[in-house]
Amino acid sequence: MAEMGSKGVTAGKIASNVQKKLTRAQEKVLQKLGKADETKDEQFEQCVQNFNKQLTEGTRLQKDLRTYLASVKAMHEASKKLSECLQEVYEPEWPGRDEANKIAENNDLLWMDYHQKLVDQALLTMDTYLGQFPDIKSRIAKRGRKLVDYDSARHHYESLQTAKKKDEAKIAKPVSLLEKAAPQWCQGKLQAHLVAQTNLLRNQAEEELIKAQKVFEEMNVDLQEELPSLWNSRVGFYVNTFQSIAGLEENFHKEMSKLNQNLNDVLVSLEKQHGSNTFTVKAQPSDNAPEKGNKSPSPPPDGSPAATPEIRVNHEPEPASGASPGATIPKSPSQLRKGPPVPPPPKHTPSKEMKQEQILSLFDDAFVPEISVTTPSQFEAPGPFSEQASLLDLDFEPLPPVASPVKAPTPSGQSIPWDLWEPTESQAGILPSGEPSSAEGSFAVAWPSQTAEPGPAQPAEASEVVGGAQEPGETAASEATSSSLPAVVVETFSATVNGAVEGSAGTGRLDLPPGFMFKVQAQHDYTATDTDELQLKAGDVVLVIPFQNPEEQDEGWLMGVKESDWNQHKELEKCRGVFPENFTERVQ
């Protein structure tokens, strides 16, 4: 009997719950269709929105805090392994081994204490704070269901009140029929029964309305008080949580700093006792910096003449590459210069060497000179003039030009238009080949008034080739015809050379810094990264000078002074500096 009773109670409860769900669903449908009004509380809805926002922020903070704790634990494990590695490599006979082991143990304990305090003062507090949200969330949902029940009971009661007159008409109609069929005494009892039944339904609907309203108001009042209070409590919770985290982290780093200082003292004492075995870390140059060492210099950019080991632009012999030290001298990290970003490499034009056939072709009758404006040519004085101190010192009267079928060779390969050449008569039969003719004096008149320094000795091979190309009978004719250049040609040639005879010690050298080698022009902007570097802009002209100490020169770097600074200050020590060679182009 007890089992049957419990089953009946359970079945009745289930039926009641199903009935409530159906009633609520019906009420929501009517509200959505607009056939039933809905009770709304805008203030409470705002509190619910704040509650959902607060729950979202708290959940995110809890997730991030757990991630932070996981990172602390991982850092603890990494620090522990590093300390164990130090203990393993620390030899027993080394001083300070016990201190190092103690520092490692304290380091491990400090990490454990930091992690545990974070869990106690931050994570557990966060869990407690978020623990109240599920209960309030369920109460908000229950309050919404009770509001639907209240609206349903209210609508049912209002419908009974509205249908009161209709029910009375339905009750009166059967009475009129009964009056004809039933005796008089039965009609009064039947009417009283129908009225009592209608009143009972109305009373039940009213009781349900009052009950639903009471339950809803109780829950609504509680939530109206708790939700604003919970929303305002978030400020204090955030402050306490982050203050705890910041304080714990500050204390942790202070203690860790002390341990690291103690470990550093132990290692310093170890280094002092093993000072002879100090390991020096050598910095490696970066990929984008110009490499340093004994490597071949980078080829010059387009438009600049390629210098050969025999003859340079200033007609000074260039030291052979074999004279450089064979091994790279290591430098301290302070001496290693980090190079600037490498600009796009220019296209390189391979230098052309003068072959013997080409030298011989200069004296051939079929040789047609061409004008070359891209590469300034270097003037090489003919053999007879190279032994003289100055061309202006030749005190010979010029001879009138005479026709000669022999074409005068161009100085140092300088191209001169064919129409500017004038035929002269050969003086081979008149003047001896060993004596300088007066035609040489006429040739010297067209040159600028500069005293030529004795140039370096030319290679033996070139001398033999030139000497072999001219027979004894043709030597005097060639010397005579070399002076037959008109004044216009001579002036054009000297303007093209533009002071290429770098060996002269005239007035052109007075405005140049001591040890001047050549000029370069910046092709790209370069920002100086050190006090001893030059700040360059595209188009700046730099006067290149040698390093005071050749061992300090790094591969890819040159020493120089900007031409504008030199012309303004004339102070080499203050104006000079180093700059990357690949940012410039040689112009002279």
From Swiss-Prot:
Gene3D superfamilies: Arfaptin homology (AH) domain/BAR domain, SH3 Domains. It is found in: Nucleus; Cytoplasm; Endosome; Cell membrane, Sarcolemma, T-tubule. Residues 29-276 form the BAR domain. GO terms for biological process: lipid tube assembly; muscle cell differentiation; negative regulation of amyloid-beta formation; negative regulation of calcium ion transmembrane transport via high voltage-gated calcium channel; negative regulation of potassium ion transmembrane transport; negative regulation of transcription by RNA polymerase II; negative regulation of ventricular cardiac muscle cell action potential; nucleus localization. Its main location: nucleus. Keywords: Acetylation, Cell membrane, Coiled coil, Cytoplasm, Developmental protein, Differentiation, Endocytosis, Endosome, Membrane, Nucleus, Phosphoprotein, SH3 domain. GO terms for cellular component: axon; axon initial segment; dendrite; endosome; glutamatergic synapse; I band; lipid tube; microtubule. Phosphorylated by protein kinase C. Heterodimer with AMPH. Binds SH3GLB1. Interacts (via SH3 domain) with DNM1. Interacts with SYNJ1. Interacts (via SH3 domain) with DNM2. Interacts with CLTC. Interacts with AP2A2. Interacts with AP2B1. Interacts with MYC (via N-terminal transactivation domain); the interaction requires the integrity of the conserved MYC box regions 1 and 2. Interacts with BIN2. Interacts with SNX4. Interacts (via BAR domain) with BACE1. Binds (via BAR domain) F-actin. This is Myc box-dependent-interacting protein 1. It comes from Mus musculus. The gene is Bin1.
